[in-house]
């Protein structure tokens, strides 16, 4: 069974939770929070630093434990805090694997030398190359798309075709958006920057800021609730928040637009949940078994269905409630570029003054 340990304390208080360079992070080690040495030496146990909600990953790890007998200890915190913590702990980290909801954070961890390159045929057969690092030091597990959710009583679907449309004045006081600290917002803005350039992206962000006003939320589920209740007409969220809401409230007046699908459009913005083995791990073979379990068809199906995400294994079908993956295009900005795009994106977000 997956054991839920005390959540990690954040190791940074930066507004946008920037990744701290390794030398600076080294000063942040808190020895009292490290796992006991007996835990570190347990051959039948893995420690996973997870940026994913516990309820969405614990059942998968429980299934892995039932199959292999290997226990998984799950320590949860924000993705940026986890990467900074790995830097601070260095070779003394108890973590065997890092699991995050953002490819950019995984690529930053890879670039900082925190993850171990892998040679695994199971991974290369199961997960297409665009969803993993070139050296397999991180591997995508499931996909999510940044979409427009709208209230069907307030909006007609042909009123919106692009995310950029949401910056138009007609959506003044009708729009809800994530706050500026959202990893999803930061990754989405990075893709828009890479596609359209800084000038157009800045105008887009200024429009979002003005149109949303006070309708800025910490949780994407709050955005979906606001749209469902008619407090606003439209919002920007990852797709699965809408389908999760509809699973419990099927009559809610909600629908999804996969944006930017017109000819010449950038395509829907995609990110992945992914995992990598930490370089200092002493349980590499067991960690590989976990990754092998997660990329196999059964693991992919379970992992994706828990949160209405898109499996990355080409032979595993998504929940039929979701928009058919073959019916829309994804943006062409490589996931591995999200790391290099991040800092300039945060600077632009700050300049615009998003809340």
Please state what every model-predicted region is.
Residues 14, 22-36:
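Bacterial N-terminal signal peptides
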Residues 40-47, 65-68, 168-170:
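Immediate post-signal peptide segment of exported/extracytoplasmic ligand-binding proteins
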Residues 51-58, 77-81, 94-232, 264-266:
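Extracytoplasmic ligand-binding site segments that recognize negatively charged/polar headgroups
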Residues 51-72, 245:
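Short, polar/charged alpha-helical segment
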Residues 104-108, 228, 233-254:
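A ligand-binding cleft/hinge motif common to bilobed small-molecule-binding domains
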Residues 147-154, 270-283, 302-305:
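A bilobed periplasmic-binding-protein/Venus flytrap-type ligand-binding module shared by bacterial periplasmic
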Residues 173-180, 293-316:
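Periplasmic-binding protein-like
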Residues 199-201, 309-355:
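An extracytoplasmic/periplasmic, membrane-proximal ligand-sensing/linker region
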């Amino acid at each position: 069974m997956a054991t839920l340990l005390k959540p990690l304390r954040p190791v940074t208080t930066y507004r946008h939770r920037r990744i701290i360079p390794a030398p600076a992070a080294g000063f942040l080690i808190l020895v009292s929070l490290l796992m006991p040495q007996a835990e570190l030496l347990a051959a039948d146990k893995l420690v996973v630093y997870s940026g994913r909600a516990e309820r969405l990953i614990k059942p998968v790890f429980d299934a892995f434990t039932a199959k292999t007998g290997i226990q998984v200890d799950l320590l949860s915190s924000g993705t940026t805090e986890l990467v900074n913590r790995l830097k601070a702990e260095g070779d003394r980290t108890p973590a065997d694997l890092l699991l995050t909801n953002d490819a950019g954070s995984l690529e930053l961890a890879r670039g900082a030398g925190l993850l171990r390159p892998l040679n695994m045929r199971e991974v290369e057969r199961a997960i297409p190359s665009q969803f993993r690092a070139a050296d397999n030091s991180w591997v995508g597990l499931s996909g999510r798309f940044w979409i427009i959710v709208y209230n069907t009583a307030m909006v007609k679907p042909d009123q919106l075709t692009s995310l950029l449309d949401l910056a138009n004045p007609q959506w003044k006081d009708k729009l809800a958006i994530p706050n500026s600290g959202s990893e999803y917002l930061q990754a989405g803005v990075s893709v828009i920057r890479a596609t359209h350039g800084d000038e157009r992206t800045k105008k887009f962000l200024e429009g979002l800021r003005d149109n949303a006003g006070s309708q800025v939320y910490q949780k994407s589920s709050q955005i979906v609730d606001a749209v469902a209740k008619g407090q606003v007409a439209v919002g920007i969220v990852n797709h699965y928040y809408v389908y999760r809401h509809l699973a419990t409230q099927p009559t809610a007046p909600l629908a999804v637009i996969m944006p930017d699908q017109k000819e010449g459009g950038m395509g829907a913005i995609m990110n992945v949940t992914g995992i990598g083995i930490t370089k200092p791990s002493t349980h590499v073979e067991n960690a590989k078994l976990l990754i092998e379990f997660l990329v196999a068809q059964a693991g992919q199906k379970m992992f994706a269905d828990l949160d209405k995400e898109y499996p990355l294994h080409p032979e595993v079908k998504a929940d039929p409630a979701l928009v058919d993956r073959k019916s829309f295009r994804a943006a062409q900005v490589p996931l591995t570029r999200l790391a290099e795009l991040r800092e300039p994106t945060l600077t632009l977000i700050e300049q615009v003054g998003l809340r």
